[in-house]
Amino acid sequence: MLYFFLLYVKKKYILDRYEKEKKVIAYYVNNNERIMEQSNKALHEKYEFCNIRRDEIEQAVKIEAICFPPNEACTYEHMVPRIENAPDLFLVAVDRKTGKMAAFLNGLATNREHLTDDFFTNADLHDPAGANIMLLGLDVLPEHQQQGLARELMEQYKEREQVKGRKKLILTCLPDKVEMYKKFGFKDHGIGDSVWGGEAWNEMDIVLE
């Protein structure tokens, strides 16, 4: 069955999402014509953006192990309950040519205001009605980098959660990634409470307006 709905996300554009078999494809609509910036159009032609499926857990764990060192990467033990508790907060990009996952962005909902290390290991902290999202990982395989995939995942995530009424997205990152997230619209609040993996992490957030 095909579901159709329109979401006003920009003054000029309407986001026209079609959901089929839990897969989401996005187009921008203006004056009843489907349009999309060329960069986005190219990405959507190459990748399918959708919520993760249960049978993709192994892929997600392997990608996490490639993108993060062992002291930081989410293990299978913690990835499974994260996906089971909040599959709608696990956005993936699937390479249309290979059918394999190329990247993902995931998180948990909560009313808490700061990202602490327990979110990385305890998916039961997820509150479906939570006002904020703790982003727990943005992973892009090396061979799929340098084409705007991380930015596109983040933009789609922001739009999805804003429509749901979320207030903020919150993340932690190492200092060398702060500038990248600033370009995505996040505000840096300096070193936060997290010491995940024995590291000092900057806490950043973005208000969804």
Where are these regions (language model features)?
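Helix-loop element at the rim of GNAT/NAT acetyltransferase active sites that forms part
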Residues: 62-75, 82
